[in-house]
Amino acid sequence: MAGLKRRASQVWPEEHGEQEHGLYSLHRMFDIVGTHLTHRDVRVLSFLFVDVIDDHERGLIRNGRDFLLALERQGRCDESNFRQVLQLLRIITRHDLLPYVTLKRRRAVCPDLVDKYLEETSIRYVTPRALSDPEPRPPQPSKTVPPHYPVVCCPTSGPQMCSKRPARGRATLGSQRKRRKSVTPDPKEKQTCDIRLRVRAEYCQHETALQGNVFSNKQDPLERQFERFNQANTILKSRDLGSIICDIKFSELTYLDAFWRDYINGSLLEALKGVFITDSLKQAVGHEAIKLLVNVDEEDYELGRQKLLRNLMLQALP
């Protein structure tokens, strides 16, 4: 009975180790989903399992968490099988709870520092000027505006990696001192950020190339499997169309946001298709279909926005 009286705020014993891996325990998930189930939902669920849960077990069910624990004791739910729970939630039309049936811990929602700063400055600076200046002023000559997409560093002679990041290792004391001197930014210097763009061309299908070209007549099953694996690996390496890695430098927050929007909505991919999927590449691959894969690290984008925020703050200073 002590386990049935456990409060939702209490931590289950198995949850301590799983918190380090960004996971919920199964019982913690029961707490989250069960607290959102109404008494009517619990009655309907208990009625649906009248033939599965005995009278004594059903008499101990007081809320949604107790019902889910009863399902676990009956072997209907475990850490690798939520199918029964998902099906029951769909039956009682509680589709709003389906995203919570997971052991993956949700990330805490944090306010965006850039949006927060823009909102504060729009109230602090824009509004007073609008009230104090009833007559519109002539537009001031703006500074030289950089292009929409800054110049990127990437090779022009084929799919080679252009700029490799330094290997992570333990540097010497002298190099650490030099790095400290060079990395320290000037407070008045304009900050920039680097966004790494990865572009790769691939065949859409490899089955046609592997069929009929992978064969082994060795008697031992392990040797036969190993030889076929080596043959398939050699064929796939020969079909590698290469990749390009570019570091794009941004100094304006608006251009960085525009670049990220184009990446999210697919405009960047469509624009790069005309650059990388050339007529010579199509002629080399023949009639096989190829696709272009584009990747930008979201973490680089978020760190870059925070870094370029400093430029806006410096511009706002008198």
Swiss-Prot record:
Post-translational modification remark: Exists predominantly in a mono- or diubiquitinated form.
Gene Ontology BP term (one): regulation of apoptotic process
Record's keyword annotation contains Nucleotide-binding: no
Key words, A-Z: Apoptosis, Cytoplasm, DNA-binding, Nucleus, Repressor, Transcription, Transcription regulation, Ubl conjugation
InterPro entries given in the database record: DEATH-like_dom_sf, DED_dom, DEDD/DEDD2, TRADD-like_N
GO CC annotation terms, alphabetical: cytoplasm; nucleolus
GO MF term list: DNA binding
Region (Disordered): 128-147, 160-191
Tissues expressed in: Widely expressed with highest levels in testis.
Domain DED: 25-103
Stored SUPFAM superfamilies: DEATH domain
Protein name: Death effector domain-containing protein
Native source organism of the sequence: Homo sapiens (Human)
Gene: DEDD
